[in-house]
Swiss-Prot record:
InterPro entries: UPF0180 (IPR005370). Belongs to the UPF0180 family. This is UPF0180 protein ABC2430. NCBIfam families: PRK03094.1.
Amino acid sequence: MAKIGVQSNLSDVQQELQSKGYEVVQIENEQDGQDCECCIVSGRNADVAGISVPGQMSIIHAEGLSAEEIGQRVDEIVTQH
């Protein structure tokens, strides 16, 4: 299953994605997100969180979304790749 990076303060999102079978890694810096299909961050700007992502990696901004909504977006991203 796809590897998904999740900012450490989003434990409900981590649990949702693990229940869907995704490999979840906590991201605290740009190295943590390498090799991930996409990353989920809590704010609008990943750079503010100290996380920069390489190339065309998808970023999901968790602000205002439920864990279930984020899980659906991850499903869409993974099926497109």
